[in-house]
């Protein structure tokens, strides 16, 4: 049976920015490596972090799950990565896209950019673009590395190599600034990736988390579990007055009263803070809470009958 956490929900949503900052720091503990221009090579690299965080970031504490998956799939002896897939499925079942909203460094980076005071644009008319990330997951993360191989049977990590802006932000830029040899070796591929990063930065100022909505394969994978994950959104229909404030507050274009566990919901909690009746909260566990609500209603009815 799932449990609702109304008070905790309010607190988590209010301090989400601090939680994101802490998660980013934990994901990138080895900060002195930025000055050294070196990569962390410890045992932590054998474990994947939950969010999108480049393996080549000097400070990273672990491996990027998308990069690690491509490395295994694209190896000369092709094998499906059961460890990484199992790890991602576990996270998907436990948390769903809560990871996107609270634990992903690149998601937080986009949110910080969106705080820059300029005119903001809505993405409600661009909903078709949200399906692009599933194509990126299937084609660039799995199919191309697995089947487009060189003479020795190895495939490139296509997403990391040609599309991921996080690799440039956390990896190529800091490493090239600290290491003249790397700086001298930068070529057309870096220029291409850098232009993608600049585009994402510009779009993030205008749109809320555009990369997360349209292109992130990790978000696409976690989205597959949003409706069945243990961490979910709960709307108390008895408290809801249908004012629509939660839907207007949602920057992921989700109406939590209609689809509380929509694939685009990142559990950011903006709807929780916007609700004047405190009808929206986080819920963790199995079930939808209806049995517990029905039991409480029955108990109240029995008590009323006794009083009469």
Predicted segment positions?
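Non-ligating segments of multi-cofactor redox enzymes
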Residues: 1-257, 263-308
